Amino acid sequence: MSFYESVFIVRQDVSLNDIDKIVDDFSKIIKDNNGAIVKKEYWGLRALAYKIGNHKKGHYYLLGLDTTPAVKQELERKMKLNENIIRFLTQKVDSISNEPSPILKNQSTENTPVIDVTAN
């Protein structure tokens, strides 16, 4: 078994419930083939770096996988066939960290209010 990180972008008009169904379908494929999802991160609705088709925004999702290359290929095939997924990228990695990804860390610090302690 190998470790993979897969990031996919779902169309902006898809609901969070539908995104959860997509992730559940991917989880089922992996678990049915003796693999495991080690990490799941929803990065939120973000602006795309460039327009893809008619899309300017998308829901970003990261999956950390422990599976075989054949199952990874099947997962990528399902991503290609899913009309709600506008882009995806899967990379082989040496290990999957339990820490939040840098994007998720940055997102959580952006949402944290800054308190000015110098003002009296």
UniProtKB/Swiss-Prot annotation:
What Gene Ontology molecular function terms does this protein carry?
A: small ribosomal subunit rRNA binding; structural constituent of ribosome
**Segments of skewed composition (Polar residues):** 97-112
Q: Which parts of this chain are annotated as the region Disordered?
A: 97-120
One GO cellular component from the entry? cytoplasm
Sorted alphabetically, the Gene Ontology BP terms of this entry are: translation
Q: Which UniProt keywords apply?
A: Ribonucleoprotein, Ribosomal protein, RNA-binding, rRNA-binding
Under InterPro entries, the record lists: Ribosomal_bS6, Ribosomal_bS6_sf, Ribosomal_S6_plastid/chlpt, Transl_elong_EF1B/ribsomal_bS6
Q: Which residues form a coiled coil?
A: none
Work out whether the entry's keyword set contains Isomerase: no
Similarity-based family: Belongs to the bacterial ribosomal protein bS6 family.
Q: Which HAMAP family match?
A: Ribosomal_bS6
Summarize the protein's role: Binds together with bS18 to 16S ribosomal RNA.
Q: What is this protein called?
A: Small ribosomal subunit protein bS6
Query: What organism is recorded for this protein?
Result: Rickettsia bellii (strain RML369-C)
